[in-house]
Structures are given as C-alpha cells and as structure tokens.
Amino acid sequence: MSVCTEIDYKLYTELKKIAGNSLFLFNENGDFTEVVLNSSFKFLVPIGFFSSIDIPLKKPIEYKNNNNNIEHSKNIILPNLYPFQKHVVSEVLLSMEKKNKHKRPTYITLHLACGFGKTITSCYLLSLHKKKAVICLPNKMLINQWKRAIESINMDHIVSVDGVSNLLKEMVKKTADILIIVSRHLLNEEFCKKIYLNYDIFILDESHMYNLMNNSAVTKFLTYYPPKVCYFLTATPRKVNRIYCNDIINVSNSLELKKYIKIVEFFFETYSSDTIKQMVKKLNTNYNKYHMYTEKILAEDVPRNELILDTIIYDFNKMLINRLIIVTKLRKHMMFFYDRLSEKFGLDVVYLGDAKNKNISDIVKKIKSIDRFIFISTTNYSGTGLDVPTLDSLVICSAVMNSMQIEQILGRICRSSVSKTRTVIVFPNTSIKEIKHMVGFFTQKIITLAIEKLNFKKIEKKGKKKELALCKAFNLQTH
C-alpha cells in the first residue's frame, strides 16, 4: 500500500515540482482527485516517490512479508552485455545498496537511449534478483521481443496473449517465474491481488506511454498494489511519472555509429488540387487541432511524394541505403509508397508494416534475416517496440511529431548491428503554400533533435526546380 498521509506544505512542494500544473492522487476514500494545499483529506502517496533519498520519509514504508524466489535459479543463463550495459547494472546495484541502507523502496527508472538494449539489460537484472517478476507491456507488439529475451536466460515464463481471464485460469494449473502481460490486464483486480502476493518485481516497459497523472489501470495498480521492486524502462521519460518512480539512472550508449541526417531541400512550384483545396479550409479550425489535416494535405503533395520516391530509388539502387524503414503518419500515405516501391523493386524487397495485418510479426521476423529491404510503416506502429536491429536507414515522410515521438522514431536505426553507418532522410519543403511554414517548422524540430541530442551530422542537398535529372544530382551522397 502507498503512504497514506496528509499533504503538508513541504511534501506538496516536492510533489508539485514533478507534477507541474496539476497534481492528482487517490485520496483515502479511493477517489482520484486533484491535490490542493491544506486539503483536509489524506492522500495515498506512491511508495516509488520515496525512492529518492532526497525526499524525507513521512513514515516507514510497509512491505509485504513474503518472498517470491524463482524456483530454478541454478538454471539461469546470464546474458552477455556490452560494457555500457554492464555499467547500468553496476549503477543499479549501487543504487539498491543505498536504498537498502536508507530503507527506501527499490524503484528505478532506466532512462536509456533507443537501441541501448533495455530488454537484455533488464533480463540481466532479473537474473541477479532471482525473484519472480511481471513484465508489463503497452501492447502485444513487444511480446515476441521479450519472450525471446526471457527464453535466452532460461527462465520459466508465461506469455499472456488471450486475455486476463484465460491467464488466471492458466495460473491455477501452472506457476511461472516470469509473467509477460499487457497493461490492460491490470484492470482486473483479482489479477492485481494475485501478482501482488506472488511476484516481487514489476517491469513497466515503455513507461513514457503512460501518463500517471491520469486515472489509469497502471496508476491504480502502483498505488494500491505496489511491488517490492519496480523498474520503469524508457528512452523518453515523462517527468510526471517520477511521482511513481523517483530515481533515474541514465547511461549513454557508446556504440561507434556514424550517424547522418540528410536534408533534401527543394523549391517547388505551387501545387494544388480540388481535394487539397477542400482540406485547406479546415486548417484553421478545430478539425486540425492535432494537425491531422496538415498531414492529410501533405500526403496529397504529388511533387513532394515524387521527390521522396526519386530519392529512395536513387539511394537504394546506389546502395547508399540498404535496410530502410519509411515512416508516414497516415495509412493511405503508407499504401501509396508501398504500391509504388513494390512495383519498382518487387515484393521480395518491399514489405508493409501494417498494424492491421495479423501476420505482421512474421514479416518483421523475415526482414531481420534479409540483407537488403525496404520496410514501410506508420509512425504509430514503428515508433515504439519495432525490433529490427539491422535497420540502417530511415526516411521520414510525415512532418508533425512531438519530441518524444521523434526520438522514438530515430531510435529505430540506432541499434547495434554489422553496419556502423546510419542515415535519416527528411524533406522540409512542400509544394502546397498553405502548409509550407508549418512543414518547415516541424521538420526543423526533427533536425535539431537529431543533431543536438542524438549526435547526427547534417548533410544538405538543395535544388531549385522539380526536375528528375536535377533531383538525382542533388541526391548524391558523400559518405
């Protein structure tokens, strides 16, 4: 159980530093409500908030007494780690030692870059803990990645793919050291009670996917059924989530990668169509609140689409890019590039990353073993959890993304593989005058984050007119 207490000025100040404008917690009556200064209510402050030694303890934290050790610890196979991953393990062990000394909960956020190897590093930690653990995922796309990792360390496990009711029935017949679940399982209170009693470690993968200032299943679980040990895994942590896990370990990835961002600039003549004219009318309305119509119009930009195709075809034929992922915002845009590129290169080279395809995991598995391919998907599918370490190139066809989404997308090509060169290609110009400045603004945001935060080097290619020969001339690459 969380720490039930009145929120005095000092505690309120510490919580507000993290929460920002609005602070929401469960009160003693079970209501999820905003916390105001001098409230007469007592509130449940998550024990993970006190994982930081800088936060004074209101009262000793009570833990469940039972220990849930794994049954066959002698059979565990420790995974091989890179030196920078071993450094994370050392930092975690040092943090645990301090927490034990000060009687603080072992709640740690592993803030590690995309491509760092958070999954295998976490498996190493599980091997050291030798405690039963629950691995909680935001969606099923990540299941296979975790299943392979757990199998590699030889831990007994259950993967839940058929819902929490079926899992509860299976757990009556069989116990497992590791449960791999999706977060919606935590809506079931019977299941929450069961894992609270029978499992000691909880890993929340892709923790940035959850806003714990909302009354969600994960928020409620961490408040009412807090595990003994908890890890949040993310490349892009949400600040507000520190209220539930208030100690962060951040270690940089020292992989020797040569990373380039290629900016293909073109000065198009103005283009429009009846479809575009109709959508332009909605640009300054609530319909475009999340820039959906900006992206819809961009998808209809024929000259820009042709430039993107020319760039991809030229660079792929010249073997400047080899294992490529193309990302769009809209499914329609994705299908456009898939149809054109599959016609050009064939279905043995071009693959569709369609979340609606039940066999998508088989497609992802297949391209891992292919030397050269083009994989086309949406930002929604490929942003988090796409596990293709061999990717070396990324073409971004969309424009509007927040910083978290940008870093997740760029992270798809920052993993360790045989190739040491990584290339991102962006297109900051559009032939549609009504969205010209907006597209330029958001593309510059991508460029700035790639260079300043992820250490990409800039390559600029410029042109004046949309002419094929000129287009190809400016697509020459110098690395």
From Swiss-Prot:
Q: Where is this motif: DESH box?
A: 205-208
State the SUPFAM superfamilies in the record.
P-loop containing nucleoside triphosphate hydrolases
Q: Where is the Helicase ATP-binding domain?
A: 99-255
Where does it live in the cell?
A: Virion
Which residue intervals define the domain Helicase C-terminal in the entry?
308-469
Tell me where on the tree of life, at the top rank, the source sits: Viruses
EC number(s) given by UniProt: 3.6.4.-
Q: Does the keyword Transcription regulation apply?
A: no
Predominant location: virion
Molecular function terms, GO-annotated: 3'-5' DNA helicase activity; ATP binding; DNA binding; hydrolase activity
The record's annotation in Pfam families points to: Helicase_C, ResIII
Which Gene Ontology BP annotations are present?
A: transcription initiation at RNA polymerase II promoter
Task: Kindly state which keywords UniProt assigns to this record, in alphabetical order.
Answer: ATP-binding, DNA-binding, Helicase, Hydrolase, Late protein, Nucleotide-binding, Transcription, Virion
Q: Does the keyword Nucleotide-binding apply?
A: yes
PROSITE patterns (UniProt xref): HELICASE_ATP_BIND_1, HELICASE_CTER
GO CC list: transcription preinitiation complex; virion component
Tell me which residues bind ATP.
112-119
How does this chain assemble?
Interacts with G2. Might be part of a transcription complex composed at least of G2, A18, and H5.
Q: Member of which family? A: Belongs to the helicase family. Poxviruses subfamily.
Function description: DNA helicase which seems to act as a postreplicative transcription termination factor. Involved in ATP-dependent release of nascent RNA. Forms a stable complex with single-stranded DNA, and to a lesser extent RNA.
- Record's protein name: Transcript termination protein A18
- In which organism is this protein found? Yaba-like disease virus
